[in-house]
Amino acid sequence: GYILSSAVEKMTDAQMRAWNAAPQVVVTSFWAFVYEKPDAKSLRVSDVVAACRLKLLGKDKQFYHVALPDGREGYLPMVHALPLEKWRKTVKHDAQSIIATALSLSGVTYHWGGTSVKAVDCSGLVRTVLLMHDITLPRNASQQAKVGEHIEIAPDFSNLQPGDLVFFGRKATDEKPAHVSHVGIYMGNQKFIHSLAWVHVSSFNPADPEYDEYDLNRLLWAQRILPQLNTIPEVKTNDNVEFYNVK
């Protein structure tokens, strides 16, 4: 496929090593702006979203002096970010914390290809939420469906755990294999959160007001990923991801 050249910044290995070795801050607010000066009334250089990592050049008043990967510099209000190592000490990897983050995105609109708090598709929601917890996993639902421990879902859902990923799509037939086209995060009590039109909670239980018959009928299986964190190549905290550790 193709991407706008202005949307990426090419780097050599040496440049990537320098970027990774530099002090960084992580955006902790849903979104914020980088300004030309340490003054929120000055012109904006760029917007940034949750989990963005920026090079830390210094501090000025209540602002971080930061650099973007393309070399632009500006000032980010400190209230919207934390130094990388300090942020890592605050991040949790348990299911309930991850579900709470997913719920905080409730109402965010669906956008195909979206991978930020501005808009997300189904797998983009999963990836964005986990990135906000310093975890990287594959981008697309069809890729995520191959990661972790495969779970054939019991009729009463009793073998599912909060934090499992639940997958939907076309069921397998004698002629064709199953085709994954949707994913959500299981919350427990037969409920899951996903991005379909917008981010919201649905239920497999016909007695619940959030009952989702459409998705129940196309439910395929689940994948358990959190116990496999940093034990399999596809699910890692970012301090173990090769991209952030170019040698």
Residue spans of the language-model regions?
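Aromatic- and glycine-rich peptidoglycan recognition patches
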Residues: K10, A40-S42, H179-H182, Y186-K247
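Short, basic/aromatic beta-hairpin or loop at an interaction surface
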Residues: W19-Y35, L131-K146
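Second-shell loop/turn segments in exported
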Residues: E85-K89, T109-V117, R170-T173
